[in-house]
Amino acid sequence: MLPYRQTDKMTELVLYEQIDAVAVISLNRPERLNAMDQAMLKELNQAAERAEQDDRIRAVVLTGAGNAFSSGFDLKAQAENTPQGVNEWRPVLKRNFDACMSFWHLAKPTVAAVHGPALAGACELSMACDITIADETAIFGEPELRFGAGIVVMLLPWMVGPKRAKEIILLGLDDISAREAKEMGLINRIVPKGEDLNTALSIAKKLSRIDSSLMAQTKQALNRSYAIMGMEEALEFALETDTQIEGEGMPTKAKFLQIARDQGLRAAITWRDSLTEDD
């Protein structure tokens, strides 16, 4: 029997497909490595809400079109239209935070299918999913501090522990292989190149066959254990810290965005990388 399929576009930025009882949500800016601008994040939130409200959907897969899961939040768009001060930054960062955490809070199980880069906000988005599958091309990292930005969704300590989290965040590492990510507990499984989506879909179909009320209540209990340990309060504190950082405006971030405006994002990244080259 062939699977039931229904494909819709939320916009050109987010694709939504139903395969049997699974919603497959795809970030869809492949020409920009699925960099997440504010329009995409709004549609991503709407896609998550759509899956939550649809009784036919019992599991969700999140992936990226083309050669990347996502390069993270859109720095080119930020350079072209930079918020000023805490009051302008607060709603932007809250939208970023909510879009990522919607996959953590969804009552239905969520599975990330990662290939290529999953950096900064996209790394955080992949962590927010219940299960993360990565193919052998996947690269993870949190490079924000290297260009003067803070961490929007500081899930990393809860996934890999304080020592690894501090190393990754404070050094701004952005070259963590799938193998390294698996060893530190950042992802669940590594699969051959190009098999991440098929594997994630297979897992999601298995999850969809479990009683939906049982699944929702058990996921809620699992999430509650982290809340009792203080995760939600810690995440809110980190979000407020990032809001203050961006509102204040770090000199490195100002320089990075200026180079991005004048010479392009690639030149800005080259300049950023030069700051932390080995002596």
Locate the predicted segments by residue.
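C-terminal alpha-helix plus adjacent terminal tail
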Residues: 1-19, 173-178, 198, 202-205, ...
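Charged catalytic carboxylate motif
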Residues: 39-43, 95, 102, 199, ...
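Glycine- (often His-adjacent) and acidic-residue-rich active-site loop
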Residues: 64-99, 118, 264
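A general structural signal for well-ordered alpha-helical segments in protein cores
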Residues: 96, 153, 162-165, 215-218, ...
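Crotonase-fold acyl-CoA enzyme core
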Residues: 101-212
